[in-house]
Every structure is written in structure tokens, then in C-alpha cells.
Design a protein with these regions (language model features):
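Active-site cores that bind ATP or allylic diphosphates and position pyrophosphate for catalysis
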Residues: 23, 33-37, 41-42
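Active-site beta-strand->loop->alpha-helix modules in alpha/beta enzyme cores, enriched
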Residues: 1-27, 52
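A long, hydrophobic alpha-helical segment
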Residues: 43-45, 51-52
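C-terminal accessory domains and tails appended to enzymatic cores
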Residues: 27-28, 35, 49-50, 56-161
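Alpha-helix capping at helix-to-loop junctions
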Residues: 19-23, 45, 76
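Internal, well-ordered alpha-helical scaffold/interface segments
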Residues: 12-16, 37-40, 65-69
Length: 161
């Protein structure tokens, strides 16, 4: 699910590739994989055709400044065309020094109840209660279905929690 056609179509291409990576002779010069990789969806707020399910949630509070720097690097997307499409251009600060605070308010949300539940699964209730910002992922049904141990290996920040 996504608002941008390029993102939706890329998602379909990845789903198609998720199956084909293990099929011999699709790309004769490349060995097919013996085990399908794990494919993940990034969190969205769309409900149709399928609502997002936060199978994995990661506390990004310690690195929120890096996330904001990454978003801030996409000037035209976050300060021009998304505000234009959403008809909130006047909310975008003219002063670039205020851009990251604007992004934090407009583009980074607190964990919703479903994400909070996933945080509790991966971090425990006490630690999850302290999370200010999180990113969540859904396991794609077209790839390998990882065990909890495999998820913790893929997301080392979840180890020991």
C-alpha cells in the first residue's frame, strides 16, 4: 500500500522477484537461491486493500536525529510537493533551521496501539513504554517466514530484549 504509484508498482515487482529468486534458469548467469530471503513491508497508514500488520517494531528514539536528517535530505518531497498535494504549504517553515522540528511533528508519529503491542513483544513492557519513536515492519508472505531467532539476527538491536 502506498500513495505513490512508483512505490506500489515497485512493491509488486519485489513480490514477483521474491518467488523468482529460487527458480533455476530465470537468470542463467546467476545461481538461484536455495532459501528465499525475508522480505519486509515498511509501515503505512493505508487500510485498503490490506491494513499494515506490525510484525516487527524497532525503537528508533536513539537515532531519531539520523532519521530526521534523512527525511530532510528529500527537500522537494517534504517541503514542496507533499505539502502542495495536501494543501498545507503554509505550514512548512521558511527557515531551514526549523525543518527538522516540522518533520518531527508532521512526518514522525508516536507508536500507535498496534505498534506499541509489537514493541512490547520485542522489548518487553517496561522498555516499550519508554519508546518515543518506532519503525515497524510486516513480514511479506512471499518470502521466507523467519523464526523469532532469525528476526533477532536480522535486527541486532532486538537481541537480549
Amino acid at each position: 500500500n502506498d500513495y505513490h504509484p512508483d512505490h506500489r508498482y515497485t512493491g509488486v515487482l519485489v513480490q514477483d522477484a521474491a518467488f523468482m529468486v529460487g527458480v533455476p534458469n530465470v537468470a542463467p548467469d546467476v545461481e538461484p537461491l536455495r532459501k528465499n530471503p525475508v522480505f519486509l513491508y515498511f509501515q503505512d497508514n493505508f487500510k485498503k486493500p490490506n491494513p499494515f500488520q506490525p510484525d516487527i517494531a524497532v525503537d528508533i528514539t536513539p537515532v531519531i536525529d539520523k532519521k530526521l536528517a534523512g527525511l530532510d535530505a528529500h527537500q522537494s518531497q517534504f517541503y514542496e510537493w507533499l505539502p502542495w498535494i495536501g494543501n498545507y504549504e503554509e505550514e512548512v517553515p521558511k527557515d531551514p533551521a526549523k525543518h527538522k522540528a516540522y518533520l518531527l511533528q508532521k512526518r514522525v508519529s508516536k507508536p500507535n496501539p498496534e505498534v506499541q503491542k509489537s514493541l512490547e513483544k520485542w522489548y518487553g513492557s517496561a522498555r516499550a513504554a519508554k519508546v518515543l519513536y518506532a519503525e515497524a515492519f510486516e513480514i511479506c508472505e512471499y518470502g521466507s517466514q523467519p523464526t523469532e531467532a532469525e528476526i533477532r539476527a536480522l535486527f541486532p538491536m532486538l537481541k537480549g530484549n
